[in-house]
Design a protein with these regions (language model features):
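Bacterial Sec-dependent N-terminal signal peptides
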Residues: 1-21
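Positively charged
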Residues: 17-187
């Protein structure tokens, strides 16, 4: 286990070296419209949907000055009463960066948590099958097989790196949202 952790930290350090700030186009989208409101979810059915939802996302530096604003606007999108979800990935609002919100059913009061550059570094062989939907194409639901447990790494908004084990429905949500970062939809 110690070798796995050391290897993981080495990989994290090398990946963070490739992280970049938001592009000019991404910056424009983040500050577009009323910045006190949510960012619009991009449906897969729209031409924009395929552009963002089928593309592999890039790592982001955690010190980009627009990151807190994007974080808040994504949170408003996933918790909006018109389309409440249990998770959201940045590509769903038109930003191809490795950023997700996940509802933590494994914590008291089930808070949402923001993950920067999330990675799944191990997954259990024990699988579970469950019914999943998606904010980007609400009309499609289906059975999806996911790992019951996963070991993840991520950076928080303060720039602190974490390694954590997730299980059950929280692990399912995390896997679903990280799939979005690879352009994968309802696997």
């Amino acid at each position: 286990m110690i070798k796995l952790l050391i290897g993981t930290l080495t990989i994290l350090c090398s990946l963070n070296c490739k992280a970049q700030n938001f592009t000019v186009a991404e910056q424009a989208l983040i500050v577009s419209g009323d910045t006190s409101k949510l960012l619009r979810l991009i449906p897969l059915a729209e031409p924009e949907g395929k552009k963002y939802l089928r593309k592999i996302s890039l790592d982001i530096t955690c010190n980009d000055p627009l990151l807190p604003l994007l974080k808040e606007r994504m949170y408003k999108a996933v918790t909006d009463s018109n389309h409440k979800g249990v998770g959201i990935a940045a590509p769903q609002v038109g930003i191809n960066r490795n950023l997700i919100w996940v509802k933590r059913y494994d914590k008291p009061n089930m808070p949402f948590e923001f993950f920067i550059n999330p990675k799944i570094i191990w997954h259990s062989k024990l699988l579970r099958k469950g019914f999943e939907g998606d904010l980007s194409f609400k009309e499609n639901w289906g059975d999806v097989v996911r790992s019951h447990s996963i070991l993840i790494s991520y950076t928080d908004i303060s720039g602190v790196q974490h390694i954590e084990m997730l299980e059950d429905f929280t692990a399912v949500i995390f896997q679903h949202e990280t799939d979005h970062l690879f352009g994968i939809l309802l696997t």
